Amino acid sequence: MSISPMMQQYLSIKENHKDCILFFRVGDFYEMFFEDAEVASRELELVLTGKDCGLEKRAPMCGVPHHAYAIYASKLVSKGYKVAVAEQLEDPSLAKGIVKRDVIKVLTPGTYTDSSFLEDTKNNYIMSLFIHDKVSAMCFADISTGEFNLTETELDFEIILNEISKFSPKELVLQENLDDKLVDKIRERFDVVYNRFSNEYFKEHRNENLKAQFSNYAEVNMTEGLKSCANGLIKYIIDTQKTALTHIDELQKYEIVDFLSIDINSRRNLELTETLKDKSKKGSLLWVLDKTSTAMGGRQIRKWIERPLIDDEKINLRLDAVEEMLTNVSYNEDLKELLKQVYDIERLAGKISSKSVNAKEMISLRGSIEKLPAIKKLIKNFNSELLVNMENALDDLGDIYKLLYESINDNPSLSIKEGNIIKEGYNKDIDELRLAKSHGKQWIASLENTEREVTGIKSLKVSYNKVFGYYIEITKSNLNLVPEGRYIRKQTLTNSERYITPELKEMEEKILGAEEKLVLLEYNVFCEIRERIEKEIDRIKGSAKILSELDCICSFADVARENNYCKPVIKRDGTLVIKEGRHPVVEKVIASGNFVANDTVINNSDNVMMLITGPNMAGKSTYMRQVGLIVLMAQIGCFVPASAAEISICDKIFTRIGASDDLNAGKSTFMVEMWEVSHILKNATKNSLILLDEVGRGTSTYDGLSIAWSVIEYICKSENLKCKTLFATHYHELTKLEGEIEGLKNYSIAVKKVNDDIIFLRKIISKGADESYGIEVAKIAGLPEEVLVRAREILKDLEEAKPKTAENTEDKKTNIVKEEPKKDSYQIDFNYLERESILKELKDTEIMDMNPIECMNKLYEFIKRAKKL
């Protein structure tokens, strides 16, 4: 048996798109065959059938209606599949033989542009990576907005991973020979689709391609590696979209060092855009700061949070604008009301460029542009430099508004191929065809009245459908009234008969001819209008960018007013002074007024490190995150949750807070912790901020204390480091280092003890903690009373057996015993540390997860170990 001609056509197209699920247009459906059908049936829950194709067995098949294909395609794309859309390229009724078909677009996670299925306030990036001569070039594009960013840096896996984390691309374009270790790291950390191409793919015709695509190509300093990287990405985009995209016309080169660096772990620990627990926006810093009114503003504020500034001049421009907006409440409110009426013109510009915009979206663009003069007039009332610059640069796009107002119907059809999109009076030929169509329909209405009078059949109707055209319909109960020979029978139905007349068919040809010509002419005129606007895409994008930044300034002002934030003073002298600082997120989720504010005073000279002790649950981690977030907020140009703040610009923020086991990679808690600490110590500079929580807790007491002690010394004593650090620990022995290590000062979370209960005061005080209060915390957690009683007995026994160490030696400040005759050498009392280890394990024991037998066994183990001391 031979394969049918249509199936041969299908297989030929599929051969060129092996990595895609092929949507093959057949009449009113898109059909999928063979393995594609099986995958689509499973993923989309479609009925799997079969189709005769000339083979011995029927080809597995499933299909979706053509008008709803985008819904099904988006579901596949969201699951990481690529979808190739093969369209009919000619009218089937006019085709000679098999209808011509070909792929008109390939839908992929990183190139999907249908705004119905994209997150409004999140960019949809696709990334390319090209490594050459130990230099990594990276490009990030969002074809829905026209954004194209590029940078390069030394070959460092962590830097690459950090950039991927900032942009969160949905798809990657990589070299075939890229190091598999890097590819594995990317796959482990990110849910992303990737494609691999030869080096030749990246390099081929790069100068010609980039010159043709980007208007500023000649002005941007690009290495050969960066050119290859950009070329590979733009080629892939054009290959999938099957058309040139004129709105992607500006290369935006940036330097990584121009922004505050926050690595992946720190970004996660600080919960900048999503929470650690459930990856939701609610509970993140973005959730607090995002009061934007437009989708463009929502995307922009996310970018600002992901890429804080280190240029004090740019930071102060934003802060001054926020301050002025904050003090002019009425103008701010008026601006917000106008911005709420602005659609996502950034993505509308992208749809114009990709020729996928419809007439209703053109009306949305017109309505948005209509608000620009009023917005421009309002901004004119401000005097801060940034807002003045915005007013001067904002193009009100008056000529584009005029064109859209004169040309597009106020309530047009959704499809641009159904007519009713061009406004009356804009095009003479369209008006004449509409008149002809209108006269024809008037004739039809007149015919219906005439035939009713002639026949006496009041229910007689002249109707239309696409199969039979116009016809006269008479119910069977009235057939006896039909004059003989007046009509030609066309169709018999259960309850009626349908007839035609030569005159009716003649008028039908005139009406349908006018309608076909009208629809085609309206479509062509719409395309001309679209092309005229496409030439002004850069102006539209420029105004969209200004509106997005203005929206962010309004949002920052709202948040500052609502939460009583202060304007930080930006400095360069290394100081960090925060008066009555608060955690921006935590204070929003607890009862109003219950958050305890705390001061922070630190620098990178004589007050380098805050050594913070105190019981678990007292608030050490919250306090440290609070400081990190306040610094970051200041550097994005936002007011901060404090009564006053002096913030010296940081180049990097590092955090080591909370467990982050990578068990799938075979790494223990302690191994991950040590890797993170190592990364921090190797990459921090004098201008960095380090937040370390419980370093050393993942190993034995001896090792943990030694490592924590050594890390403290390294940070405080290293001339190349000595940066601002908050170091929380449960090792109380370390508090004796104050006075021994220059720049280290003790702090603790205040606790009030009432009988056997404790009250967390949440207040940072300048002294070390007196004790751990582990058993009291265990009581709060709900451990059985008999376990708590026994724990107190064991603790009392341990404390009574505690050897004399630092308190009864000359070296009281370091909590160590000097060993003779070696001067300046130290020896730790290992029996004491073993007791501390038992105590720590007792505090960390999750009694609620154990049965009574396990509890008794655990207590027996503690007693056995204690007796050996």
Swiss-Prot record:
Keywords: ATP-binding, DNA damage, DNA repair, DNA-binding, Nucleotide-binding
An individual GO BP term: mismatch repair
Pfam (any one): MutS_II
Highest taxon of the lineage: Bacteria
PROSITE patterns according to UniProt: DNA_MISMATCH_REPAIR_2
Record carries keyword DNA-binding: yes
Chain sites annotated for binding ATP: 614-621
The keyword DNA repair is annotated on this UniProt entry: yes
SUPFAM superfamilies noted in UniProt: DNA repair protein MutS, domain I, DNA repair protein MutS, domain II, DNA repair protein MutS, domain III, P-loop containing nucleoside triphosphate hydrolases
SMART domains membership: MUTSac, MUTSd
Cellular component GO terms held in the UniProt record: cytosol
UniProt-recorded Gene Ontology molecular function terms: ATP binding; ATP-dependent DNA damage sensor activity; damaged DNA binding; mismatched DNA binding
Coiled-coil residue windows: none
Family: Belongs to the DNA mismatch repair MutS family.
NCBIfam families: mutS1, PRK05399.1
Role summary: This protein is involved in the repair of mismatches in DNA. It is possible that it carries out the mismatch recognition step. This protein has a weak ATPase activity.
Name by which UniProt lists this protein: DNA mismatch repair protein MutS
Gene: mutS
